[in-house]
């Protein structure tokens, strides 16, 4: 939804929360600085230390904490600004009628809400405290806490999802990330093969299970039907459909789906599209009016895209292509011209305070896809982490050093190739990215993405 910071809500939370007596020693940077030349295991950065400290203090596996943090935010606290569900920080501690994790974290840690919202280390501590409390409630203790698979029901509870299928969607994504491993924002976990103990969720049909009823309900044949609660949209239309609106969720895929099923949200969209693979969930029938753009609701269809406007790493080629297919299908069925006058960003509608999809959304590429072209994927935007990351003439550690990146930097990757292996913070990667503007190569290990190979980027 790409909204501006809603500090009035944070102020209300502060007024309602008891002031904490415990304080952590200062805010930690979102991106830790690794050594300039990684040839062995690097010392962990401050964010990595915060995860380890929280894990040790509350006996919650570090992999679980990092998996949740990456699923929620790609390990970015977004300067304490709220998500669409009023969640804060890289662990998405929330304050809404169905998700009390922020107030729980404040009570359990003694930390004030403002610190939990804005300080990444405090946010991680708060999440660990909540997870520890939930683990106690289900009797997860002793050596069983070392078994990552046993944490499944605890992670599902942490999601406070609207229903079982959405809770399973959320938790399966966390475990998928744990399986892939993470190397982002100075934090790394090695890939782990984990067999989740789904408990009561074992009998919950995963979101996307198709039935004759769900197939009949969707307007776009490739979509999964998972309806929003009826109090979050209006049945029917008062105007002809003429415009398709592109949104960014300012939150996770599972979290957005759950929020649209929450009666207190008073918002919805017709479609939600996942970053990792372009999965499409339809939540409101096109014949009905979703609540996503205020006065423009009656004549628009809304597409929400998982991610945050200030993090281009969420905008994968899989998501662009999947979304464009949905938009093209809608336009063709409804006779809507496939141009920018009729396919707009949220920010372009009247009387909006929202900024999505933001400057990182590639409109040129998207419209080419909508119009049925098959362009080469664009140069992909990613963010590096750390200071002193070297760009070399070749993907080799003995390649000529062209320059060093001074700190977290947005880079434009044209392709990727295998080269020398680089090890940092216990993770090894032999994939290198070719940078458009710097004219050389950097190791993928210092690009903010959890897998060794960057998504959608072609091989050199």
Q: Model-found features: residue ranges?
A:
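Basic/polar, cationic surfaces and motifs that engage anionic cell-wall
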Residues: 5, 170-226, 237, 309-381
């Amino acid at each position: 939804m790409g909204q501006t910071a809603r500090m009035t809500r944070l102020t209300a939370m502060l007024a309602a929360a008891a002031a904490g007596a415990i304080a952590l020693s200062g805010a930690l940077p979102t991106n830790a600085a690794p050594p300039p030349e990684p040839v062995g295991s690097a010392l962990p950065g401050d964010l990595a230390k915060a995860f380890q400290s929280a894990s040790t203090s509350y006996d919650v596996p570090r992999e679980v904490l990092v998996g949740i943090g990456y699923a929620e935010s790609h390990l970015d606290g977004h300067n304490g600004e709220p998500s669409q569900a009023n969640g804060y920080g890289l662990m998405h501690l929330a304050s809404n009628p169905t998700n009390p994790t922020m107030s729980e974290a404040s009570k359990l840690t003694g930390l004030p809400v403002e610190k939990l919202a804005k300080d990444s280390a405090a946010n991680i501590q708060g999440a660990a405290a909540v997870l520890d409390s939930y683990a106690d409630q289900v009797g997860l203790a002793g050596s069983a806490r070392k078994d990552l698979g046993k944490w499944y029901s605890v992670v599902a509870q942490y999601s406070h999802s609207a229903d079982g299928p959405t809770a399973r969607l959320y938790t399966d994504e966390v475990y998928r990330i744990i399986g892939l491993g993470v190397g982002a924002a100075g934090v790394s976990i090695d890939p782990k093969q984990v067999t989740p103990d789904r408990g009561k969720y074992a009998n919950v049909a995963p979101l996307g299970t198709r039935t004759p009823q769900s197939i009949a309900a969707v307007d776009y044949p490739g979509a999964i039907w998972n309806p929003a609660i009826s109090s979050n949209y209006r049945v029917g239309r008062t105007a002809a459909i003429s415009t398709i609106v592109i949104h960014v969720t300012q939150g996770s895929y599972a979290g957005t789906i759950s929020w649209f099923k929450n009666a207190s949200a008073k918002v919805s969209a017709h479609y939600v599209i996942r970053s990792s693979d372009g999965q499409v969930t339809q939540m409101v029938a096109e014949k009905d009016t979703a609540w996503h753009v205020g006065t423009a609701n009656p004549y628009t269809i809304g597409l929400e895209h998982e991610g945050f406007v200030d993090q281009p790493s969420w905008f994968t080629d899989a998501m662009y292509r999947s979304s464009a297919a949905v938009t093209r299908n809608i336009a063709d069925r409804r006779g809507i011209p496939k141009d920018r006058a009729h396919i707009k960003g949220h920010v372009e509608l009247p009387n909006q305070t929202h900024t999505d999809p933001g400057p990182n959304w590639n409109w040129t590429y998207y419209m080419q896809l909508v119009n049925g072209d098959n362009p080469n994927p664009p140069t992909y935007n990613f963010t590096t982490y750390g200071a002193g990351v070297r760009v070399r003439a070749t993907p080799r550690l003995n390649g000529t050093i062209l320059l060093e990146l001074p700190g977290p930097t947005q880079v434009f990757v044209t392709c990727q190739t295998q080269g020398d292996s680089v090890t940092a913070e216990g993770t090894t990667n032999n994939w290198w990215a070719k940078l458009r503007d710097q004219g050389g190569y950097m190791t993928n290990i210092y690009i903010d993405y959890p897998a060794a190979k960057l998504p959608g980027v072609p091989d050199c």
